[in-house]
């Protein structure tokens, strides 16, 4: 079915397992895709890995679509020890899925192919007033700083700046402000100024994906959902939608 870099797959699974209890991977000739929402329906994750990103990728015979349903915590355990250079091979056999981790030793895991129901709108159309592309490591470190101060992070964008900040009790405050001259701010497009607040905990759940992404695209409007797009050098793409905080 396919062979992929085990370490990269591990980072994806680690993050997604904090959002979804079960995942349904859809495999077609174009590649692999997983979409799902958390039980509270606050966050949506969408993973797309094109067939060209795999070491090996094939569809058997005239099969056009294969569904792979799995418990995310179980899958997390399968790839838990994956290191850089390891490879993951996946073979789907109707009601079973064989995972082979090729490392110093060869590890095989045979798991049931679960029937997973995905209740996610097929097409979510959103327009955003502000879109900023930022170096991934800067976003990751900024959110970790924010967590030290409060539970809510505020994104604020103007014509020539992006601010990520939080205000906590006892006048604690932290802010990362990027301008168009900042090396970390790759691109900034602002139709009109926008400010919106989000739960830090939900954002932290996807920080693992930042390890495999060079940049993160942040899109938002005032009091509207936040869209984060993580782009990997191999062509993989992770989109994360998060509802604004009402607190």
Swiss-Prot record:
One of its GO terms (molecular function) is DNA binding. Keywords: DNA replication, DNA-binding. The keyword Lipid metabolism does not apply. Transmembrane segments: none annotated. CDD domains: PCNA. SUPFAM superfamilies: DNA clamp (SSF55979). It comes from the Archaea. It holds the Pfam family PCNA_N. GO terms for biological process: leading strand elongation; regulation of DNA replication. Sliding clamp subunit that acts as a moving platform for DNA processing. Responsible for tethering the catalytic subunit of DNA polymerase and other proteins to DNA during high-speed replication. Heterotrimer. The subunits circularize to form a toroid; DNA passes through its center. Replication factor C (RFC) is required to load the toroid on the DNA. Belongs to the PCNA family. This is DNA polymerase sliding clamp 1. The gene is pcn1.
